[in-house]
Amino acid sequence: MPADLDAVLIHHGITTPTPIQAATLPDSLAGRDVLGRGRTGSGKTYAFLLPLVARLAGGPRAKAGKPRALILAPTRELVRQIEEALRPLAAAAGLSMQTVFGGVGQNPQVVGLRKGADVVLACPGRLEDLIAQRHADLSSIEITVLDEADHMADLGFLPAVRRLLNATPKGSQRLLFSATLDKGVNVLVKQFLEQPVIHEADSAQSPVAEMDHHVLHLSAREHRIPVLADLAAAPGRTVVFTRTKHGARGVARQLGRAGIPAVELHGDLSQNARVRNLEAFHSGRATTLVATDIAARGIHVDDVTLVVHADPPAEHKAYLHRSGRTARAGASGTVVTLMLPDQVKDVRSLTRAAGIKPTTTRLDGPTHPILSELAPGERSRPGAYVPVVSQPPRRPAGEGTGNRKSRPGSRARKRQRAAGAR
């Protein structure tokens, strides 16, 4: 590995590789195609960024609209997280990069591509649009990374991914990372990876030993929000998952009314709102994030101590991916599933398929000693999260703004000055 990349890792306190990094780096740095299987939080982002940057370092600059490397990810949040990890590595190697995703105007992205971006980090849909408009050309790609391929399949992106991979040169290096190897992902591997070396570490198919799994059997639906508020009021970061965007919005607002600084994350939010809410959660201004399943893959936040499934997910894969928000990189974490009487059968099937044996506790009301055990510490309810909105500086008293409507009494003052002059 180039010494300047080592220096970046040391600066960020990274001195020992995770299992997935130790397994894949020798092959990926040697230029081989790699299939890496590892759960979220296993360190796979650096497992593909390091060989990508090492391969491009010292090479020719990218031509306008023709990147040398492509990273595909399923969500805007994940693209931004990868961008944050890539930025210092790219700077050390003298590489430029450009993110490409929907939900924002395309003009800045087009400008970045025209300047000649070495690395493009993209969601499939917007990248296909820019290629169709001839703003991007993948014929010079040397290395392609497909991150969270199983999530791409879940979201129906595989046809677009196949078209994009077909647009990259045959024989170029390809790295594919996935928590599971489902049928759709397996088709990608067979079609686009040449004699791939397969490495598996911390598979999402197996129980996660670092997590404590609990099921709270609620006797009535009206206990759901009080129980959530009690858990979220404990010290530390909490991520709450719901099945629907409407549910995420409602839970976040009800937690806010209960004094919990909570933000929501789902597909109905504008990109600016998503960024603002994630930054509030990162900074600690909001201690609870309420998200939908789609957002589960894009949230990379350290020190999440508690994950709560306010709505049990529909399948075990979603349970494992949601739960991966805690116990990241070997840290401990607690996962709680709220279960209503009509959900007992589904939750039992879910946990059985996930390969876990949770501790189940029945709650006949909104309070129970188990809540303090699952989320220990003194409860704090400082109030709902209020987004920070920049305001213009106040003007000294008597100083005008140039807007007649904002200067009540100005005519009276003119009459007074005129009278004084007379």
Task: Please tell me what each predicted stretch does.
Residues 236, 253, 257, 283, ...:
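Arginine-glycine-biased low-complexity disordered regions
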Residues 5-7, 14, 62-132, 140-143, ...:
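Conserved nucleic-acid-binding Ia/Ib motif block in the N-terminal RecA-like helicase ATPase lobe
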Residues 116-130, 279-295:
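Conserved two-lobed SF2 helicase motor
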Residues 25-34, 46-63, 87-88:
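Walker A/P-loop NTP-binding motif
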Residues 70, 89, 98, 109, ...:
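Interdomain coupling/hinge region of P-loop NTPase helicase/AAA+ cores
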Residues 1-37:
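Conserved pre-motif I regulatory segment
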Residues 291-307, 322-330:
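SF2 helicase motor core recognition
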Residues 124, 148, 292, 303, ...:
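Walker B catalytic acidic pair
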